[in-house]
Amino acid sequence: MKKVILAYSGGLDTSVILKWLSEKGFEVIAFVANLGQKEDFKAIECKALSTGASKVYVEDLRREFVTEFVFPALMGNALYEGRYLLGTALSRPLIAKKQVEIAEKENAAFVAHGATGKGNDQVRFELTYAALNPFLKVLSPWKDIEFLKLFKGRTDLLAYAKQKCILTRATIEKPYSEDENLMHISHEGGKLEDPLYIAGEDVFSWTNSPKNAPDEEVFLELHFRSGLPVKVVNLNDGSTKEDPLELFEYLNRIGSKYGVGRVDMVENRFIGIKSRGIYETPGATILWIAHRDLEGIAMDKEVMHLRDMLSVKFSELIYNGFWFSPEMDFLLSAFRKSQEGIEGKVNLIIYKGNVVPVSRFSPTSLYDQSLSSMDVDGGFDATDSKGFINIHALRLRAHNLVLRSRDPFGWRRGIIDAEIMGKGV
């Protein structure tokens, strides 16, 4: 019998896929990834077995997710399209990696997932399979003609589940879809597909509304070594966390309580479709802001600016599913080098949705207070600035001399179209 390793969540889609594959003659081994989502994993295991799985792997991947995926992404200041911290995108290559490992252990020739043909996840799963074991065959039912003839949408899935006695809590009227892991929870679909629709508090399941957050701020002290968070201290009550997983979970609790990390955005999917997503990413938001602030005092200017250019590509590669790729190896190596001197601590105020760095210290600080002072010379010869400016002005003077008769900057007088401005909205 042909073996297939199915990435199984226990939800409607993957339960139907499990049964469908089983009835097509596959021996289905279900793989359930514990990435920190609030689920009853024993119940999911029992459901997989009752639906037709021959075996179930339930793997606790929380620590690996934080240390091998989330922290490296934060080290590279990953932020897709300036807003999305990539919680879902970072989890998929880890799930797919474990699928490949189980397939090799079980001598399975196939791997399968339940991602749709419109989304990003199908790409993330399948690029990871290709990178780690190109000999595995991929079963993607939502791109299979036979499957698509049977299942046009949610109604057909529910009818099939009822017919096959598959237990499900799903209903036809599902307000939106969610993806949850230790890093974030996302909300998409349903009413949220209308960009004019204003999401109410019923959408958010992790974070308090900032207006309902505590009136007293909390002071945190975050410590970093080589760009990685190694300790958090709550200066209000003295509590401390140093274990990576415990540290991240603690920041999630603090951030959720204070309404940190909410993002409502329209993003560009890899396949070309625009999609609205609402994200709650409390702990990672706190870490991202603190890490960036410490870099300000401890990272060389040119290294920072070069890294910032690379961070845009880094974020795209994560989003598009290229975690296991030669270009990602290159970037991760470069970022690791850039973080060698990022050591020290940042003090933050967390208050009603805001994360505000208020002080920072680094033993490898490149900040010279005497040089920066407005009141003290500090060994800086101000007359040197004259030559510095003259050198940088050389090409601007040359540009003007060559193009003077053509009014080189005249076009800017119409850069703001008065007619458009006058029309309002």
UniProtKB/Swiss-Prot annotation:
One of its GO terms (biological process) is urea cycle. Pathway: Amino-acid biosynthesis; L-arginine biosynthesis; L-arginine from L-ornithine and carbamoyl phosphate: step 2/3. It catalyses: L-citrulline + L-aspartate + ATP = 2-(N(omega)-L-arginino)succinate + AMP + diphosphate + H(+). Pfam families: Arginosuc_syn_C, Arginosuc_synth. The lineage of its organism: Bacteria, Thermotogati, Thermotogota, Thermotogae, Thermotogales. Its EC number is 6.3.4.5. The gene is argG. L-citrulline binds at residues 84, 120, 124, 177, 186, 267, 279. The keyword ATP-binding applies. It is an enzyme of class 6 (ligase). One of its GO terms (cellular component) is cytoplasm. This is Argininosuccinate synthase. Homotetramer. It comes from Pseudothermotoga lettingae (strain ATCC BAA-301 / DSM 14385 / NBRC 107922 / TMO).
